[in-house]
Amino acid sequence: MAATAPPRPGNEIGRMTGLTLFTPIRRQWLPLLVLAFWMSWHAKVFNRHILQFNFIKFVRWTIVRDLPGEDLNYAYMLFESNFDGPWQHYIDAFAYVIPKDIRLTWGRGINFPHPPPAEPLKAWIARNSMEGGTYYCAYPEASTRMVRSALEVRKRVGALARDAERLGPEEFKAAYERFLVDAQAHL
């Protein structure tokens, strides 16, 4: 009898992984984080570092000051994200590409290891992460890049279809060949 495979964690579906962290924030740093999050929401230039990673499908930070029925000693930061591949690779990118952003966001928290290197950060995340209770991914077998490429091809096919109504056969042939060349990077 063949051994059964171990169950997959609830935060993995297809090639996607969800990561949820719930970490305390030191009181004296709460106003700085509130300001930083407000600025990132209202001035998108502050999001450019996190948005450079094309493997991220979703990312959100929330400051939690209270919970119904619970007296919290600290405000907490709830971090939620989903991305292509294992979380360890995701954290490598954070630790080495945007370490200042990571230190600003979590560096004022308790026992934060201040990357780089990535290994202490991974250990800290492993201690502070929570398995997702609910996790949804519309295209679990597709990477973020695949989904973005498919959306771009769909947009270009739509433009070609609109143009086709007014083009003659030779013009359409030329437009179709341009479409194939232009869309090639997304196929």
Protein language model annotation of sequence segments:
Residues 63:
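Short beta-strand
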